[in-house]
From Swiss-Prot:
GO molecular function, one term: tRNA-uridine 2-sulfurtransferase activity
CDD domains: MnmA_TRMU-like (cd01998)
Highest taxon in the source lineage: Bacteria
Amino-acid positions noted as binding ATP in the UniProt annotation, renumbered to this chain: 11-18, 37, 126
Annotated positions for site Interaction with tRNA: 127, 342
E.C. numbers: 2.8.1.13
Annotated region described as Interaction with target base in tRNA, given as residue ranges: 97-99
Organism per entry: Staphylococcus aureus (strain NCTC 8325 / PS 47)
Top EC group: transferase
Protein name: tRNA-specific 2-thiouridylase MnmA
Gene3D superfamilies given in the database record: Adenine nucleotide alpha hydrolases-like domains, HUPs, Translation factors
């Protein structure tokens, strides 16, 4: 089968990465369709809907490339699967990662299903990751060539079935090369700045946004031995290891968030970047997913490396099944500021094995009060 007989539906955001993704596939001779996903009603404070601006860029790019385009609305699916999860996690005092859930439930489920209904053989996105297809048909996901842009951390929940239908055309090149291609082709998005922050918040103030959905409950900010250091403006606004926004003055080292007590609405703080309370030995994680589950013996356990947040250096770990629903991830050396609600993502070299959601954090066999 030649490329012209293979239909690839590209998820287009109106950014440079997805624009170049569509261009590269078109150049390679595939039957390419562009689809713009509207996942959130994101009218800004000035009454301007940024999604409309992005869709106009998609239209212009698709016309430049010479491919058909459509818009599809996933606002209900996004609210049900991503945003309610986001709010529920904050209610529990955790720090969620909505991008992981968006990839799992929207971009590579709702969008993938929609594309298959359009007769697609594959979907493609502008993620910085790579797919390795083996002769027997199974696939592996590898880090993107550009280390600064690698996005496998956010793709850790994707299954073998999902990834077998996915292409990441720009995963083999650097971001600077993506920009160069866009400029060379005269694409309207060539100089458009990258989107930052959580997809549905955009450039809005995080505190202001969150307070629209969850009422803030101010409370005491104390040290672990009970010394009152001030007031917090609501536990949901703070994450483990956070330094800024505490409002604690005085001499000496800066102060950091080391824990939360939901029952008493207390924020725990301690002084010093390397304070002992910020370090842990192992964690328990649930909702785990592996691209190739049969390759990992969870009963015996296995060694690999892991990331506990995006753009963090890999840490050597030992992964073993804790029970039917959870994994125990033991660190080769203590790790700072592990945060419940965030993803722990596993690697063997460049291969992303999968990931899980961090639940509880331990040191010396005792659970830390990161979130209690």
């Amino acid at each position: 089968m030649s490329n012209k007989d293979i239909r690839v539906v590209v998820g287009m955001s109106g950014g440079v990465d997805s624009s170049v993704t569509a261009h590269v596939l078109k150049e390679q001779g595939y039957d390419v369709i562009g689809i713009f996903m509207k996942n959130w009603d994101d009218t800004d404070e000035n009454g301007v809907c940024t999604a409309t601006e992005d869709y106009n860029d998609v239209i212009e790019v698709c016309n430049q490339i010479g491919i058909p385009y459509y818009a599809v609305n996933f606002e209900k699916e996004y609210w049900d699967k991503v945003f309610t999860y986001f709010l529920d996690e904050y209610k529990k005092g955790r720090t969620p990662n909505p991008d992981v859930m968006c990839n799992k439930e929207i971009k590579f489920k709702a969008f993938l299903d929609h594309a298959m209904n359009l007769g697609a053989d594959y979907v493609a996105t502008g993620h910085y990751a790579r797919i390795h297809r083996h002769e027997d048909g199974h696939v592996e996901m590898l880090r993107g060539v550009d280390n600064n842009k690698d996005q496998t951390y956010f793709l850790n929940q994707l299954s073998q079935q999902q990834l077998s239908k996915v292409m990441f055309p720009i995963g083999d090149i650097e971001k600077s090369e993506v920009r160069r291609i866009a400029e060379e082709q005269g694409l309207v998005t060539a100089k458009k700045k990258d989107s930052t922050g959580i997809c549905f918040i955009g450039e809005k103030n995080f505190k202001t946004f969150l307070s629209q959905y969850l009422p803030a409950q101010p409370g005491d900010m104390i040290t672990l031995d009970g010394k009152k250091m001030g007031k917090h403006s609501g536990l949901m606004y703070y994450t483990i290891g956070q330094r800024h926004g505490l409002g604690i003055g005085g001499d000496g080292d800066p102060w950091f968030v080391v824990g939360k007590n939901l029952k008493d609405n207390v924020l725990y703080v301690e002084q010093g970047f390397h304070h002992d309370a910020l370090y842990s030995d192992y964690l328990i994680a649930s909702d785990y997913s592996f691209v190739n589950p049969e390759d990992n013996d969870l009963d015996q356990g296995f060694e690999c490396t892991a990331k506990f947040r995006y753009r963090q250096k890999d840490t050597k770990v030992f992964v073993k099944r804790e029970n039917d629903h959870a994994l125990r991830v033991t660190f080769a050396e203590p790790v700072r500021a592990i945060t419940p609600g965030q993803a722990v993502v596993f690697y063997q070299g460049d291969v992303c094995l999968g990931g899980a959601t961090i639940d509880d954090v331990f040191k010396n066999e005792g659970q830390l009060n990161y979130v209690v």
